[in-house]
């Protein structure tokens, strides 16, 4: 199971919600990582957070990739 590194840019896909989020990894945990959200595309609509304080979690075995 691949793991990102802190400060790497990633893309996190959630097909069930028709959502893809991109952001920078800020913390690694035992089975998941936390990333700062830079952009979210949900159901074809792009959303960019006004501030960079929005964070999300992703399990290592979810659909994600380095960008």
Language-model features and meaning:
Residues 16-18, 41:
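Residues that cap or initiate secondary-structure elements
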Residues 2, 21-22, 33:
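Generic short amphipathic/hydrophobic targeting helices enriched at N-termini
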Residues 1-16:
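Short coil-to-beta transition motif at edge beta-strands of beta-rich domains
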Residues 39-67:
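Intrinsically disordered, low-complexity, charged/polar segments
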Residues 19-28:
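Short beta-strand-centered aromatic/proline hotspots
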């Amino acid at each position: 199971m691949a793991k990102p590194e802190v400060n790497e840019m990633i893309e996190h896909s959630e097909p069930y919600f028709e959502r893809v989020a991109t952001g920078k990894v800020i913390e690694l945990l035992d089975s998941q990582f936390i990333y700062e959200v830079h952009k979210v595309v949900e159901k074809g609509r792009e959303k960019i957070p006004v501030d960079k304080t929005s964070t999300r979690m992703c399990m290592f075995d979810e659909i994600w990739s380095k960008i």
